[in-house]
């Protein structure tokens, strides 16, 4: 299952609790697989709607099952990408422990506050995030002292051919 490109679409499941349970079962399968295959990163997992795996919680509440497995998977070389429209709906631990953060336009004050705190942004920088245009993103990398602004061209399309990822479009 993990030796090739795989997409698991959970959108047809109407009940959010069912989606969450199924997603956690898949996460557990990946976890069990990684325990037996320790070493370099061989697999990348992309989780859309990350709130279903690692929902936001109060600090005094224990981490979710998904959050604990994610923490363990990172130790075993599993690379993970989490996608969320609203950062406040995702565990703050996931956001804090991310090596790369890609931020599109955020308008809600609570989302801006969370991102501002996690990236140590000024009010001016937060105002800029709330006014980002189409294709504009702020990228934060662990090894950079401050986030950078990037423009993504719409004509660049990611394609999967023969298990190699390549960008198509103008260079």
What are the language-model segments listed below?
Residues 119-121, 125-133:
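Phosphate/diphosphate-binding loops
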Residues 48, 78, 85-86, 97:
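Conserved H-loop
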Residues 1-68, 137-143:
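P-loop NTPase motor domains
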Residues 12-15, 51-52, 86-89, 106-111, ...:
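Conserved nucleotide-binding/hydrolysis micro-motifs of P-loop NTPases
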Residues 35-39, 71-76, 93-96:
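Conserved catalytic network of the ASCE P-loop NTPase/AAA+ motor domain
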Residues 135-171:
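Conserved P-loop NTPase motor module
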Residues 93-105:
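A short helix-turn-beta junction within AAA+ P-loop NTPase domains corresponding to the substrate/partner-engaging
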């Amino acid at each position: 299952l993990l030796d090739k490109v795989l997409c698991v679409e959970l959108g047809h499941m109407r009940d959010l609790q069912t989606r969450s349970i199924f997603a956690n079962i898949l996460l557990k399968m990946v976890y069990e697989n990684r325990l037996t295959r320790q070493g370099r990163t061989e697999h990348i997992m992309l989780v859309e709607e990350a709130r279903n795996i690692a929902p936001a919680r109060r600090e005094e509440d224990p981490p979710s099952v998904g959050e604990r497995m994610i923490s363990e998977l990172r130790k075993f070389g599993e690379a993970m990408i989490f996608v969320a429209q609203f950062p406040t709906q995702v565990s703050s631990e996931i956001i804090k422990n991310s090596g790369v953060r890609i931020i599109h336009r955020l308008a809600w004050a609570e989302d801006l506050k969370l991102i501002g705190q996690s990236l140590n942004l000024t009010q001016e920088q937060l105002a800029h995030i709330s006014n980002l245009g189409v294709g504009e993103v702020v990228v934060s990398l662990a090894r950079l002292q401050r986030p950078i602004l990037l423009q993504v061209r719409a004509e660049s399309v990611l394609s999967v051919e023969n298990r190699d990822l390549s960008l198509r479009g103008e260079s």
